[in-house]
């Protein structure tokens, strides 16, 4: 298979595939006599794993570690599960942070009259000071 075939099958761009190869995240493909990359089912599996791991929140390094585990016949599912649960905990912390930000913004929005006045509790709160206008 050539890179355009692999791109169609995996849903990745040719540029992304080359990037993953450059970063050493996938097994290097063989080169044909004319220098073109030749991909196998193994490459499809690795690239699909990378794409899907990225989609569920694993960063590049973590995704590469999953590919390494995928390629390790001595891997233990406990290692994969541990990494997955660590990612879930990280996502839960991020959700808590986002919920806190949302709550703060809603409280600020509720305190703001939203009228033609220059007085704005949102700006005052975010700037850390009170805005006083000369009368």
From Swiss-Prot:
Disruption phenotype: Loss of Cu-induction of copA, forms smaller than wild-type colonies when grown on 2 mM CuSO(4). Residues 1-69 form the HTH merR-type domain. Residues 4-23 bind DNA. Cu(+) binds at residues 112, 120. It is found in: Cytoplasm. InterPro entries: CueR (IPR011789), DNA-bd_dom_put_sf (IPR009061), MerR-type_HTH_dom (IPR000551), MerR_fam (IPR047057). One of its GO terms (biological process) is positive regulation of DNA-templated transcription. Keywords: Activator, Copper, Cytoplasm, DNA-binding, Metal-binding, Transcription, Transcription regulation. Transmembrane segments: none annotated. One of its GO terms (molecular function) is copper ion binding. Signal peptide: none annotated. Its main location: cytoplasm. The keyword Metal-binding applies. GO terms for cellular component: cytoplasm; protein-DNA complex. Regulates the transcription of the copA and cueO genes. It detects cytoplasmic copper stress and activates transcription in response to increasing copper concentrations. It contains an N-terminal DNA binding region and a C-terminal metal binding region. Homodimer. CueR tightly binds Cu(1+) via a linear S-Cu-S center. This is HTH-type transcriptional regulator CueR.
